[in-house]
Structure formats: C-alpha cells, structure tokens
Amino acid sequence: MECDLMETDILESLEDLGYKGPLLEDGALSQAVSAGASSPEFTKLCAWLVSELRVLCKLEENVQATNSPSEAEEFQLEVSGLLGEMNCPYLSLTSGDVTKRLLIQKNCLLLLTYLISELEAARMLCVNAPPKKAQEGGGSEVFQELEGICIALGMSKPPANITMFQFFSGIEKKLKETLAKVPPNHVGKPLLKKPMGPAHWEKIEAINQAIANEYEVRRKLLIKRLDVTVQSFGWSDRAKSQTEKLAKVYQPKRSVLSPKSTISVAHLLAARQDLSKILRTSSGSIGEKTACAINKVLMGRVPDRGGRPNEIEPPPPEMPPWQKRQDGPQQQTGGRGGGRGGYEHSSYGGRGGHEQGGGRGGRGGYDHGGRGGGRGNKHQGGWTDGGSGGGGGYQDGGYRDSGFQPGGYHGGHSSGGYQGGGYGGFQTSSSYTGSGYQGGGYQQDNRYQDGGHHGDRGGGRGGRGGRGGRGGRAGQGGGWGGRGSQNYHQGGQFEQHFQHGGYQYNHSGFGQGRHYTS
C-alpha cells in the first residue's frame, strides 16, 4: 500500500517536471522499480533526473544509464558517490552493501523521491533568485576600478591579450610620469608606511567593518531626524499648500543621502600625513580666518526643558504595594444564646438538656400541656419513646414553630440547638444543648441562657463562652443529646449551618421513631 502511494506521487511529480519517458505508462514504473538497478529504464530515469540537477547545481558526480543488467553494480557505485556529495539523509540509501541497495523496490522508490524533490527545490530557487545582471557600464567591480584608473591617468585601452603583470606595470610607469610633472610635496607622504601582510589586512578590514556598522546606525538616526523635521514643516495650514514645492526641492537632496558608508581600506592607503594634523578651531589664528557674521549672533535665554536623569521622578510601580488583609468585624457567635437547653425549672417546652420540672413539657415552646414526645423526667437517658415528639414529622416538638420559639432559632432567640424536643428527643443530658454557638448554661427563667455553668451535666459552650459543665466536649453540639460526648454532630455542623435559619433540624431527618442516647 505504501509503495503504491509512492508510485502515484512519483508519476505526478515526473509529469510536472516535464518527463516524457516510457515509465509514465500504466504499470511501467512499478515493473522498473521492482527490478531496481537491473532495469535499464530505471537507470535512464535516474540519469535524466541527475542531468537536470547538474544544470542547476554544481555537482561533480554523474550517473550514466545502463544498457544491460550486468552494469547494475557500476550504476550503484555512481549513485552512491552522487548521494554522498548531495548529503542524502536516508540511511537505507547510504549505508549497507553498495551492490544490493538498489535491488529493493522500496529503496528504488525512495531514491526517485529524493532526486525529484531535490530537482523541484533547485528549480524553485532558480526562479526565485535569478542570476544577477551585469552592472551598467559592463564588467565587474574590479574591472570598473581599473578602468577608472586608466581614464584618470589618460591611458589608452589595453589590448585583450595583455597579462595582469604587464597591465599593472603600465599603470606604475604612467604614475611615475605623472608625478614627475607636479611639485615634490604635491601628493605628500603616505600616512601608513609599514608593510602589511595578509593577516594584517584581514584585521584592518574587520576594524573598518565594525566602524562602518557603527556609523551606519548614526547615519540612519540623522536621516530619520531630518525626515521628521522636514515633515513637521508641512503641518501648518500655510505650508500645506506648498507640499508639492517642498517635495520637489527636498527629495532630490534626500535621495543622495545614503546610510551606507563609502569608506574602505583603499582610503587608508590613500591617506596622507596632512590628515594627522589636528587644528584647534578655537585658536585665535584659526578663528580670524574662519570668522563670519554668524559668530556674532548671541543666543537668548531659553527655558529649561529638563530631561536630566537625576531630576526625573521614578515611574509608578506596576503592582500596588502589598498590604496586610484587614480583619472583618467580629460576629457575635454566642451572644444571648437564649435557649431552653439548660436545667429548666418550668414546663416551657423544649426538652433540651436535662429537664427536671418539665414532665409534660409541652409540644414546643408555646405548648404547655402537650406530651410533646418524651418522658420529661428521665435523667441521663434521654430516650424518647414519643417518636418525634408525639407529633411526628413536622411535629411541634421537632420542627416546632422554630422560627422564634424557644428551641428553634439559634443564637439570638433560640434555645438549645436541636432541643425543645427536637424530633422526639427528650434530651436528658445533651452535652451541648444548643447549636455550636448557643448557650447551654444554667437557665433560671427559661428565656435567657447565660452560657455559664450548666446545672446538670449538660452545657457545652455558651456562646463560645463559658465552659458548660461536664457534658462532653464543649465543642460537640447536642445532636441527639446523648451522654455528652457521644453525639452525631461533631463540632455542631448542623447547628452552625442552621443557627440563623429559623428552623432546627434533627440530624436524622424529620422525626424518626425512637431515639436512644446512652
């Protein structure tokens, strides 16, 4: 399957390259690559591709087509040398036994693919980068320089068969004749007198190139400043009507300015000693000779535009400075905690904690007489055989109007947590008769719980405050009001979550049968 795809691509590429051979016929290419180097048609195709490459690339190696299978080894040797010169990246074509590489069908297809791709790339490069045309005036740069010397010295055109030694000897002779006609100090002595070798000239050329690059940057800066300045002249309303005149005058002068430096090593050889003289432009003798009217013009006072680095204010920071996070207002976590979850003397309902006098404590806060589920006087047991407070489900002892009833709303107005019969729970000794933050202390008036000392093994924390009795760990909320520490609300999760919600829920749902707490 892979070989079939490669054959299809090769046939399409050969048509694009202008191949007109017999291998374009159906099945001919497949038969040729199967025989490999033993097939004369295969070798002719390879030879055609290489000949096309040699037209565009400078290749020393060449490949000749074969006439019989006996010439296969010689053909493979020629292909191996060609691939080595072209730095072929395919190891299957450059490694292994040379006489057996092109006897494999896949390797033959790979060779054709490589030669075709190289030929396509060479043709594209030739189209995109045409050969440079000869400069106007004919000849190379060196020829033009020599021609300029001959013209400057008044020499006639040298014959075509002259050698370089004869040509330069003629130039030297003509120079001596010309110098003899001028005063002795007309040209001056050269500034560079020491003989230079090839290594010295290379260093001088490198130095000149570095300086040329530096001055090219400076020239570009000055030219850009010139362009911007001239452009600003045309911003005024008066100058907008003169734009064409300004361009007509400026553009010819601007086109002459080139950022490239024209200084070369030849200028160093032509330099004379007069260039080494340093003249002080401020000296009196020089000033007298160069004086003009502009020197007498004094510049008036101009405003200080600043720009000194030591006077510039630092920029604002990218990021604002880090500040310590301010704590929010402290919330009243316990506060009034007014629940009935403590030691209750009356029968105001809400069986949280250990009720002593609330035998028939009523169904919730407002019901004095109802059974409300639970035996009011059971100490240390808290088991409720009244189901969910006698009322079941949303009974008054569980759900119990707990918006503001004693035993419903936590924190500010509620009694203890899930108390108040909380689902049939006659909590005799709830370790934490109240939500996570409500008070469970000793309650005298059935309305306000102080968070102090619980009278009878109940208590828990009163509003994050006082330690409530021995009833288990202070932080463990009074779930089913067991024996203090054994409850199902570790840390009062539900109490904290619903302490401002208006309703109190039992952990186990809405009133489930009997609840036993040891």
Swiss-Prot record:
Ranges of compositional bias, category Low complexity: 488-504
Purpose of the protein: Positively stimulates PRMT1-induced protein arginine methylation. Involved in skeletal homeostasis. Positively regulates lysosome peripheral distribution and ruffled border formation in osteoclasts.
Annotated Polar residues bias: 505-518
Record's subunit section: Interacts (via N- and C-terminus) with DDX1. Interacts (via N- and C-terminus) with C14orf166. Interacts with FAM98B. Interacts with PLEKHM1 (via N- and C-terminus).
Family: Belongs to the FAM98 family.
Organism the protein comes from: Pongo abelii (Sumatran orangutan)
GO function terms (MF aspect): protein methyltransferase activity
InterPro entries hit by this protein: FAM98
Coiled coil: none
Protein name: Protein FAM98A
One GO-annotated biological process of the protein: positive regulation of gene expression
Listed Basic and acidic residues bias regions: 302-311, 447-459
Pfam families: DUF2465
